[in-house]
Amino acid sequence: MTNIRKTHPLLKIINSSFVDLPAPSSLSSWWNFGSLLGVCLGVQILTGLFLAMHYTSDTATAFNSVTHICRDVNYGWLLRYLHANGASMFFICLYLHVGRGLYYGSYTYSETWNIGILLLFAVMATAFMGYVLPWGQMSFWGATVITNLLSAIPYIGTDLVQWIWGGFSVDKATLTRFFAFHFLFPFIVTALVMVHLLFLHETGSNNPTGIPSDPDMIPFHPYYTIKDILGFLVMLTALATLVLFSPDLLGDPDNYIPANPLMTPPHIKPEWYFLFAYAILRSIPNKLGGVLALVMSILILAIVPILHMSKQRSMMFRPLSQCLFWLLVAVLFTLTWIGGQPVEHPYIIIGQMASVLYFLIILFLMPMISLVENYLLKW
């Protein structure tokens, strides 16, 4: 008799995606982050759902409702900090996942890559709106500053900002709609994840060598299910450690002060995972130029496949490209640090140099060094 998992209309989809899926035999731990992102999304949706049961999206009560969750709801503090730090784990896994794609040339699967970029934007939008909901000082001023950037769009900018705000400033209407969208977006992300996987399974996984692995495939289960479960345990242990020992390590103390439109915090900055983009935004003195640079800092990923000049797919056997890749990582760490610093000397010039270097590496140095490597290998 044929196994039910191979015949049942629903089970056979799951079977072909997670059980009998042929996978390259050489996948390293860098291929764990896709499944880790799935776990992060699950944790965020579950904790978010329970938080939404107790949260009120009204300017008068939002801050107090979060305090109520932490103090009076059974394990409310755990839900709140799992959700807040779960977002940080989400972005750590996201950036490592994207970095893996850049290093091993996974971007040559253009459909999967482009859906991934769309997912990155969707998750960033969700996280930004979620940060506004506790209605602390940094929530309010972060929302004001970031939404205000849209006013840089010529002609329609001011009207667009007021339309998003639902008035002439960030107020009750803004908070209510941000809550509605923050609740909705994770489900859109889940749908996009399914499309992402659909396109991935059309081509099959890449592998560290970048060489087609068709002659050497192994079933996903049990080999990679076990490997993924180990990844889950490591990540959930890290998350539990963060939540139970220093839950406010990655947050901003200003967000424990209720939102006050009459008092600006000394340094307005977003959560740590947006600081690199924020540093690029601030490094350009022109408002519209800064906004364009901010968008391009992520959107530049979409043209990476076009800029691939190497005859080899992966960087595994390309030491010169590896040096540039790790320089890019160092630049991103520098930008993250600068984004959290005040706008004064010497941080301004460091931020500007790092921003220029970021675009220079991706747009010019990477393709040029690839051509040099091709020449050295007589290709």
Swiss-Prot record:
Cell compartments where the protein resides: Mitochondrion inner membrane
Binding site residues for a ubiquinone: H201
Origin: domain of life: Eukaryota
Residue positions binding heme b b566: H97, H196
InterPro entries referenced in this protein's UniProt entry, alphabetically: Cyt_b/b6_C (IPR005798), Cyt_b/b6_C_sf (IPR036150), Cyt_b/b6_N (IPR005797), Cytb/b6-like_sf (IPR027387), Cytochrome_b (IPR030689), Cytochrome_b_C_euk/bac (IPR048260), Cytochrome_b_N_euk/bac (IPR048259), Di-haem_cyt_TM (IPR016174)
GO biological process, one term: mitochondrial electron transport, ubiquinol to cytochrome c
Cofactor dependency: heme b
Cofactor note: Binds 2 heme b groups non-covalently.
UniProt keyword Transport, yes or no: yes
Chain's role: Component of the ubiquinol-cytochrome c reductase complex (complex III or cytochrome b-c1 complex) that is part of the mitochondrial respiratory chain. The b-c1 complex mediates electron transfer from ubiquinol to cytochrome c. Contributes to the generation of a proton gradient across the mitochondrial membrane that is then used for ATP synthesis.
Name of the protein this chain belongs to: Cytochrome b
Biological source species: Artibeus hirsutus (Hairy fruit-eating bat)
